[in-house]
């Protein structure tokens, strides 16, 4: 199939060569010459050309600047409303939709149409990549020809395309929008991620772990991932995984994934266990704000693997022999929507109702006596019902978590009230909870994200496993100095359970507290985490890989020694390093860092150097998600 474009390009080159030959060697003397074009003849030709619609529209477009592209703000700190570009064209009829693909290894800015390169390696890499097929992009559009332009719909569509796993960036442009006409043309521009990916997460003489993936197989909006691990002290020594994903099945906006793994990387039930899993999942997110139905379904069957070769029948054995099935489904209905077709949004919130059913059932439980009363190894079922009010607008910006790519930021509020019923270890409890989240901009273009939540379970008119959670995040304005850019990040997170029953105590290890803390025995039911990070977005680039340098300060307190949180020591971590990523590639970010812990608890050392990979973090732009209990981890 790849040879057909090559033949086409070859034919075009022959035609261009013939044209160039004709220009260089004009007609010979014995050929009948053309008549000279006088002034009156040129005026007549100009009059005739103005009668042609195509030429007339092109002429008017040049003098009225109708096809001016959305201004690029890649190097600016401005946060721009997503629908602002489309609002002046609200209500106009869509005549034609055109599609344009920007090469993966092309311009870093999708608006750049003048990019050229003579590097043969770049051309080879682009030829090896299957561009997303036009029908895949067309299936992902919310609009069609002969419909009227809705600014919110177009902004949602652009954001949906940009958040597809196989697309790096996307833009929707208005074309031929004559001020005197009620119709216009649309151009959809997309830039793919390079489809091939690979990761070597572990490599030593006794342990090798790697995977390869393709996030847009044959350009058909589908992904495939295959992984393996060989470890000499495991039984069996070889373990594998495979996952297939089809995005937006038949234009339904449902993503379907299916696969298996014996690498213990699909939500293991407990710590110090090793599991294998078969699974299938379907997910239909709130892909646009006017979507009525959202939901998802997961079916998984997991089992323990005796990876260390322990004796399962021994009472003191670390191996737990079990097998269980999870059935998890949720659905939501967006029944009040206040986004207007003219590109404006009122002060009234939108309303949605959501429901969820979760059932974890064991086919085989561990034989050890000490696990019989552990709630983790008992059947667990719950039903949830949630009412949600939200008013969210979306903005576009750069240089938050990325290396220059367009990032979508939700601004507004989300309030949810949840109730439910749970059956776990022969206890049937009612649940109630409330959670509120708000994003807002400061006058200096800083961004706040606040979250507050309270919840509890009810049994015999008494509360248990109550949770109180508060979180504050601050992102400063992007500060630019020549080609350098800086941004400051601040976080404060407080979590407490005053009456735990099933809950296990908190810790401050890794993401739960301080990066670099592992296997500490600091546990409690109240925790306060604080963090500060300064990021320098370097202009330095090597073979497409960009560098972000950072310094960080982490602080954590936990009620491990005293029930009064403020009477416990403050554990600190000071560090810095850099992150490296090529945003054209479907690879995780490489992080190189070093940390110093002045009062490190046992068994943490005072100094740590680390090279690891981290996943690409993005703002959660979906207003509606699966109902869940307030997390206590």
PLM region spans:
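Amphipathic hydrophobic-ligand
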Residues: 467-468
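Bacterial N-terminal signal peptides that target proteins for export
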Residues: 1-8
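N-terminal signal peptide c-region/cleavage motif recognized by signal peptidases
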Residues: 15-17
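Immediate N-terminus of the mature polypeptide
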Residues: 20-463, 474-633
């Amino acid at each position: 199939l790849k040879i057909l474009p090559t033949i086409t390009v070859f034919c075009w080159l022959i035609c261009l060569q013939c044209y160039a030959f004709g220009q260089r060697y004009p007609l010979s003397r014995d050929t009948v010459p053309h008549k000279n074009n006088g002034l009156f003849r040129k005026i007549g030709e100009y009059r005739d050309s103005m009668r042609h619609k195509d030429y007339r529209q092109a002429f008017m477009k040049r003098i009225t600047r109708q096809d001016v592209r959305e201004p690029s703000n890649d190097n600016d700190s401005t946060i721009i409303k997503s629908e602002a570009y489309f609002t002046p064209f609200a209500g106009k009829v869509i005549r034609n939709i055109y599609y344009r693909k920007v090469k993966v290894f092309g311009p870093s800015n999708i608006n750049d149409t003048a990019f050229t390169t003579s590097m043969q390696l770049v051309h080879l890499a682009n030829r090896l990549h299957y561009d997303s097929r036009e029908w895949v992009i067309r299936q992902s559009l919310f609009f069609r020809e002969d419909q009227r332009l809705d600014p919110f719909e177009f902004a949602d569509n652009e954001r949906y395309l940009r958040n597809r796993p196989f697309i790096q960036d996307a833009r929707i442009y208005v074309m031929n929008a004559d001020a005197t006409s009620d119709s216009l043309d649309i151009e959809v521009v997309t830039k793919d991620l390079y489809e091939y990916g690979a990761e070597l997460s572990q490599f030593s003489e006794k342990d090798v772990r790697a995977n390869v993936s393709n996030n847009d197989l044959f350009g058909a909006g589908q992904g495939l991932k295959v992984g393996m691990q060989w470890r000499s002290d495991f039984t069996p020594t070889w373990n594998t995984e495979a996952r297939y994903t089809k995005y937006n099945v038949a234009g339904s906006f449902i993503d379907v994934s299916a696969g298996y793994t014996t690498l213990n990387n699909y939500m293991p039930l407990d710590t110090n266990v090793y599991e294998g899993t078969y699974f299938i999942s379907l997910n239909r997110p709130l892909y646009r704000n006017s979507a009525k139905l959202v939901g998802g379904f997961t079916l998984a069957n997991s089992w323990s693997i005796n990876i260390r070769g322990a004796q399962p029948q021994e009472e003191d054995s670390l191996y737990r022999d079990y097998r269980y099935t999870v059935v998890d489904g949720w659905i939501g209905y967006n029944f009040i929507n206040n986004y207007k077709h003219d590109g404006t949004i009122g002060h009234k919130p939108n309303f949605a109702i959501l429901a969820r059913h979760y059932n974890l059932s064991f086919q085989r439980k561990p034989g050890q006596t000490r696990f019989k009363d552990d709630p983790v190894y008992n059947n667990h079922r719950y039903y949830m019902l949630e009412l949600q009010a939200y008013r969210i607008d979306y903005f576009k910006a750069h240089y938050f978590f990325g290396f220059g790519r367009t990032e979508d930021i939700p601004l507004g509020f989300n309030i949810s009230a949840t109730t439910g019923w749970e059956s776990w270890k022969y206890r049937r409890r009612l649940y109630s909870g409330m959670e509120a989240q708000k994003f807002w901009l400061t006058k200096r273009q800083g961004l706040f994200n606040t979250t507050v939540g309270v919840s509890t379970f009810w049994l015999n008119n008494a509360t248990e496993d109550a949770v109180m959670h508060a979180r504050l995040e601050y992102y400063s304005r992007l500060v630019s100095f020549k080609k350098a850019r800086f941004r400051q990040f601040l976080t404060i997170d407080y979590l407490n359970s005053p009456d735990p029953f099933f809950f296990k105590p908190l810790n401050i290890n890794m993401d739960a507290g301080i990066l670099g803390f592992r296997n500490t025995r600091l546990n409690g039911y109240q925790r306060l985490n604080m963090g500060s990070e300064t990021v320098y977005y370097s202009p330095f680039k090597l073979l497409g890989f960009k560098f972000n340098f950072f310094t960080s300060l982490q602080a954590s307190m936990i009620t491990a020694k005293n029930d009064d949180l403020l009477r416990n020591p403050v554990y600190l971590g000071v560090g810095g390093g850099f992150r490296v990523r090529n945003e054209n590639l479907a690879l995780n970010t490489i992080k190189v860092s070093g940390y110093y812990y002045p009062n490190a608890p046992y068994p943490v050392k005072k100094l740590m150097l680390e090279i690891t990979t981290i996943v690409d973090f993005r703002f959660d732009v979906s207003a509606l998600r699966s109902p869940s209990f307030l997390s206590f981890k």
